[in-house]
Amino acid sequence: MTEFLPFVARHIGPRHEDERAMLAALGLPSMETLITQAVPASIRLNRALNLPAALSEADALAELGTIMGRNVVKKSFIGAGYHGVHTPPVIQRNLFENPAWYTAYTPYQSEISQGRLELLFHFQTLVAELTGLPVACASLLDEATAVAEAIGVACRHHRDKRSRILLAGELHPQTVDVVNTRAEPLGWEIATGSDVDDNTAAIVVPWPDTRGVYGDFAKVIADAKAKGALVIAVADPLALTIMEAPARWGADMAVGSMQRYGVPMGFGGPHAAYLAVSEALTRIIPGRIVGQSVDAHGRAAYRLALQTREQHIRRDKATSNICTAQALLANMAAAFAIWHGPAGLQAIATRVAALAARFAAALKAAGVEIAGESLFDTVTAKVPGKAAAIAAEADKGGRLIRIIDADTVGVTFDETSTEEDLTALASLFGAKLVGGDTVLVPGKERGEGFLTQEVFHSHRSETEMMRFLRRLADKDLALDRAMIPLGSCTMKLNAAAEMMPVSWNTVANLHPFAPAEQVQGYAKMTSDLEAWLCEITGFAGVSLQPNAGSQGEYAGLMAIRHYHQARGQGHRNICLIPSSAHGTNPASASMAGMSVVVVNCRPDGDIDIDDLKAKAEKHRDNLAAFMITYPSTYGVFEEGIKAFCEIVHDNGGQVYFDGANLNALVGLARPADIGADVCHMNLHKTFCIPHGGGGPGVGPIGVAKHLVPYLPGHVEAGSEHAVAAAQFGSASILVITWMYIRMMGGAGLKKATEAAILNANYIAHRLKGVYPILYTGAHDRVAHECIVDTRVLKDSAGITVEDVAKRLIDYGFHAPTMSWPVAGTLMIEPTESEPKLEIDRLCDAMIAIAGEAKKVADGVWPADDNPLANAPHTASDTLATEWKHPYTREEAVFPGGAFDPTAKYWPPVSRVDNVGGDRNLICSCPPVAAYG
């Protein structure tokens, strides 16, 4: 028997004796017998993974510390969208480093997500107040992709009858790179200048531009309005605290990065981007929107609003493929604004602007030409032939400035900049400090008040802020409280040792465009990770750039697109997708310029191979790709997977392997060996990056050798086709996955996969006598998840799947995935991290709920007044003086007989009114004046 280091045993939930008991319940003598039954022999990897031997937590931390110690952290004045920040310790400790915040899932179940939904609501309010636009979403992935998404909104607004996009000023180079990538498959024409014609869907106005200059865009904005083109502002949110809101000068949309609201640079990410729009555009914007509704008793409650726009419902017709966004970072930004309040934010912005103004005045006095007259934080200087030399001198002094070209440098100030920095930087240009007034755009300063809502004025002391964040966290159910058995979501342990390095100075405080010789730690860490992921998946190359699983899908499909184009087969545009696929699949295919053809599934859940063959042959001249999730979205290892791949290859297509269920494969089988050409890996599922309540995620792609040349590039690396603003995407959280793999080793990773499969099969076994298990493979086995058919309760007692999901809250659980991939069912994925005790607790709850439904069916409880129909039950409702229900208070909140009251979770609201929330959309808090 393999002996594992302590970390492996701490990561995996079931003890040895638990494993034996679970196998015995399944009637199996060993784990190998289970794996032989569940996983087709034709795909098994019959050797150990070639990975470094596992290290202990202490040794892994020491090794990573040595590696990241190769990074040289210097003070950055590079700017270009990334800024030094002071993360308030009260936010770092109580939010960023708090598992109550970072282990939560996307808040689909609103009753157990009120804390983070409330803070995201404040984020939307913050953005709406800064921009003057009424509707904001609860974050996008980064500024560059936010600009691309806003352009997509403009084209949808014009019903795709306009395709020209005018970049009216100088955007950051990485933004232009991402926009160009997005434009090519969608047929957008990207132009620069000031000429607005009748085909112009939108103009994009940087505010300020990449040089730090506020240009005069009055005429081009007026022309856009006259021609019916939308105006998109790319606006710095710190500058907006002292600058006029974009809506006031004609913007229909505003986007930008919230990074400088307390979130470290992290060598490129993760950071939350914002998008705000006029009311007319509300229903066509991407991303999550948090709305305010009421619960069953009329209390205010938050929820995700207008979800019919999104990929999990609209599929290839969705507004975007975005699924996981940057909720944790958006919440940090909101907390930063709450902590400082409007006066504090303006003080930071005013100081930054004053530093830049004094620097500009000093350079002018020394005869140095600078760009523009109106500035905020950045001064761009002309230094003919001296850019490299000046930057080198700055470097010697521990400061990094931006080399724009051989004759031009940029210097950007932020909240960490000091008087000493100002003096030292001026001296590089032979300049001495002189007086200088802040040089904002005349007439464009913010005149009106903002953030008058009470929440932005009530938490000035650390005691108040600490308790505010604690009260919000207490409203939510995250992994620090209980199992989150969401199918297809892999809510496994995010170990403390994996998380610790994210806060290290050598990880958090590097600019993504720092000189290569100063980021050798990142170079080594990412190189290790790429090699390990190649070995785990069998691919020849990996890109770590995609900063979400959806972006990994997009990057992989774009690699396929560029491969076909390079071979003179750019006409290949048909993407075959099973009817059971994740909604991001068709949405990503559409964004990559492909037309979706749906492949049918058989009644047993498997892909209909005859239908696949017929459609592949029908479209053989234009077949680009086939997207498949494996194990299937039904939680089964399909025996025909290799045959599926052969059919696609025989007809000229490439196989895209959706890695959402990779947690059932690691160490047992590899996508490339099965026949895949490209696969995205959700590091926030399989490889332990936490979900953060809806992000961050990381979705790197692995590709076969012939696709390596078509991996995403980056303008900083002298290549094209970037899918994210930074070359390594959300680079700082890659250390989490590095730590996980380094502490598990190849044998530990395989053991984790086996445990995940055991846990799922044990659940299926325990529940199959009460609920049908919809799909199973050979030997009646499932993979790492199973679909429980709760429709039997609907048939017998009128109890819906939503009733079951909400009743599980009373038992102390986050509901499994509801009504996907099959309506009216629950999909359960326990992961390897859950102990047998917790798994049994979930099974006991599900069995008890079936018993409660029987009481309804038998007439003991009325169909409209029973613990399931009224779930969840809050403390205030349960303690009310009057109790008119036909069941007891104890049955309401301490159900199941053996329920442990010490583990009780109390939801803050009862069932939320979703329909009413969409009919009466409220997605930001009105200013105080609105109540006058």
UniProtKB/Swiss-Prot annotation:
It catalyses: N(6)-[(R)-lipoyl]-L-lysyl-[glycine-cleavage complex H protein] + glycine + H(+) = N(6)-[(R)-S(8)-aminomethyldihydrolipoyl]-L-lysyl-[glycine-cleavage complex H protein] + CO2. One of its GO terms (biological process) is glycine decarboxylation via glycine cleavage system. CDD domains: GDC-P. InterPro entries: GcvP (IPR003437), GDC-P_C (IPR049316), GDC-P_N (IPR049315), GDC_P (IPR020581), PyrdxlP-dep_Trfase (IPR015424), PyrdxlP-dep_Trfase_major (IPR015421), PyrdxlP-dep_Trfase_small (IPR015422). GO terms for molecular function: glycine binding; glycine dehydrogenase (decarboxylating) activity; pyridoxal phosphate binding. The keyword Oxidoreductase applies. Gene3D superfamilies: Aspartate Aminotransferase, domain 1 (3.90.1150.10), Type I PLP-dependent aspartate aminotransferase-like (Major domain) (3.40.640.10). The modification N6-(pyridoxal phosphate)lysine is found at K685. Its EC number is 1.4.4.2. Its cofactor is pyridoxal 5'-phosphate. The glycine cleavage system catalyzes the degradation of glycine. The P protein binds the alpha-amino group of glycine through its pyridoxal phosphate cofactor; CO(2) is released and the remaining methylamine moiety is then transferred to the lipoamide cofactor of the H protein. This is Glycine dehydrogenase (decarboxylating). It comes from Brucella melitensis biotype 1 (strain ATCC 23456 / CCUG 17765 / NCTC 10094 / 16M).
